[in-house]
Amino acid sequence: MAAYQFVYHMQGLNKTYPGGKKVLDNVHLSFYPDAKIGVLGVNGSGKSTLLRIMAGIDKDFTGDGWVAEGARVGYLPQEPQLDPAKTVRENVMDGVAAKKAILDRYNELAMNYSDETADEMSRLQDEIDAKNLWDLDSQVDQAMDALICPPDDAAVDNLSGGERRRVALCRLLLEQPELLLLDEPTNHLDAETVAWLEGHLRSYPGAILIVTHDRYFLDNVTGWILELDRGRGIPYEGNYSTWLSQKQKRLAQESSEEESRQKVLAAEQEWIAASPKARQAKSKARINAYEDLLAKANEKGPTTAQIMIQTGPRLGGKVIEVEGVSKAFGDRLLIDDLSFSLPPGGIVGVIGPNGAGKTTLFRMLLGLEKPDAGTIAFGDTVQPGYVDQSRDALDPNKTVWQEISGGNEILYLGKREVNSRGYTSAFNFKGGDQQKKVGVLSGGERNRVQLAKMLKEGSNVLFLDEPTNDLDVETLRALEEALENYAGCAVIISHDRFFLDRLATHILAFEGDSHVEWFEGNFEAYEEDKKRRLGIDSTIPKRIQYKKFSR
């Protein structure tokens, strides 16, 4: 039982960004020692800043913010630091250094037992029993496996950004601070690892603040939502679904200008309330409704959609046909004998651990890499659209609005005229943000510009690589609605189970041992099928295995 009523306090806290934008305005909050809190707000509302203040990193604020005496704070930033002089396992073991010191001292005394040290040994044994430290190495192994950490002896310098985050998260969870601050913890995790993390955090013996766009995660872990809105911190008791209902009521009272946001919120709430069977039926119905989607896309007239996608030419019966495709990387076989046929209107969710081969598959489908065996064929009318991640694709001297709109006040999406500033605003570039130079944008902001440009170009098969990573919940919700109404196909790499459940008609799953499963249905239905095929243990995340490949 914590010795304090609240683990953290804020009194009259204010934070202003350079240039004068007030991001936190006279915030008064206190956090219970076992509270699980999801932090929501549009990009730029101060979510990461709030965590940095609570972690003691950002001290440039007025008012008061302090942690309870004796409480430790652990913080996972979006780009965590590791000790480059240590291996992966040595970095993880830093999180249990204090626990290991207790075991080491006990073992040292046991090796040199004497009456003088008997009392200390007895006290240490009680502490080891109470903290369940006898199997500490096994606990570390389990956490590293569940988070699919790189090999124990891997050098930190060679790790990707996603691998660094998994190592840092593993270290932090094993350390078990009284206040855990997590900034986008699900980024770079596959769907099954996210499900494991949910279970771990639900029973975590401390307070947690989570910044995430993953709505299932928010529903399954949190008991409170803290919404940052125009400088205010507004707490709601309940999970994401509860917040969604309360938010809808608040918007209805505030202004008729919020009509389009209310519509999108209502659609999402209706989807959440539907039974799993009804959700799965909806994903199948999309394939049969392709002609209706095409007709709607070509209508004139007003729309309340926040994001619209320009539709390309009508798709024929053949969209993408993959036959017997295999692909190796070095001596590892990533994909072994994959075949599938994508029907018109299909939306494919591509899932699997980092490094499994998802991006390689994407590159083959786009013709940027060739398979080692098998064929990939596109239908005659297919016009693919994808985000070019190279920096050269954007002009650093243009403003955000110029880059997205091409300098045109009106954009033509199908037969609809759309105000270009409104379109740009839908990707959460509002007001003065539209005048920012592209050259000063963050990586996430650049990706939103790329996405906005690509969606107005007129493709009929979209390729999206982790589109949810750089979007706040509001923009993500608008993108989902746009994709639901999109008269085309999409192939989407994502770990966001809510996104996959709501949109996917098919799943391509990298299941390990070089096998990629093609499944008709959404993510929820795929998980049920996987348990039937491979057993309940198949949903426990583990480091991926490959077949050996020899040419």
Predicted feature locations:
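ABC ATP-binding cassette signature C-motif
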Residues: 1-259, 303, 309-551
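Intracellular alpha-helical coupling/juxtamembrane segments of multi-pass membrane proteins
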Residues: 246-279, 283-287, 293-300
